[in-house]
Amino acid sequence: MMFATNFFVTSIILLFILIFLASAIKIVKEYERAVIFRLGRVVGARGPGLFFIIPIFEKAVIVDLRTQVLDVPVQETITKDNVPVRVNAVVYFRVVDPVKAVTQVKNYIMATSQISQTTLRSVIGQAHLDELLSERDKLNMQLQRIIDEATDPWGIKVTAVEIKDVELPAGMQKAMARQAEAERERRARITLAEAERQAAEKLREAAEIISEHPMALQLRTLQTISDVAGDKSNVIVLMLPMEMLKLFKSLSDAAEAYMKKKEEEK
């Protein structure tokens, strides 16, 4: 009976020793750090790897050092030019000081989320709609700087902030669509006017050449007649000016004189 009692007590003691040792051994991954509290007072961060703590007297709080992605929910706000918009964003951040992340704020993830929401509303409220639509990179940098400064006391580093979606009222979307259509029509008219101007310029240059060289017009007329006559299905009726007839006669006389000269040489 005594042996059984001693065995039971020994087993209980060994069990407590094993539990004690198991709770004293801590293994921290490469991307983690353990913030150690001894009797309620922080003594520093440990890791990565294997280390021991004193159970009951010491406590380890594990902090992830990897970059985390935080979705900022949709925020309803009004731009500087009084346009109501719905905007959401995404924040990339990581813990650079695990001790501050544990001791300076109760929940650093929730705190970063709240700061991001209020900052997003504030920055959008100070921007015009055109900036929100066309200068998003500038606003992203501004958001990143402000949120990073606000979370720095918590040991947080904000690496990037990106505005994801911008929702406009239906009426504003229709108005912008009409404006875009009007802008496309304006550019089309400008392009057409420029083409007409260039065509008019070419015609003016051609008119100047013809006025300086009347024979050029007659040669051009002959070329046109030759091109049209190439199609045998066409019936051509020409009303030639006297100048053109004179040109034909001069060409005929020149050809006849040339033939006579050849015959005389023979």
Curated annotation (Swiss-Prot):
Membrane topology: Single-pass membrane protein
Subcellular localization, as worded in the UniProt entry: Membrane
UniProt subunit comment: Homotrimer. Interacts with PH1510 and is cleaved by PH1510.
Family per record: Belongs to the band 7/mec-2 family.
Main location: membrane
Any one of the GO CC terms: plasma membrane
Source species of the chain: Pyrococcus horikoshii (strain ATCC 700860 / DSM 12428 / JCM 9974 / NBRC 100139 / OT-3)
Keywords, comma-separated and alphabetical: Coiled coil, Membrane, Transmembrane, Transmembrane helix
Coiled coil keyword on record: yes
Protein name, UniProt field: Stomatin homolog PH1511
Record field: transmembrane: 7-27
Coiled coil (residue ranges): 125-152, 178-213
Pfam families: Band_7 (PF01145)
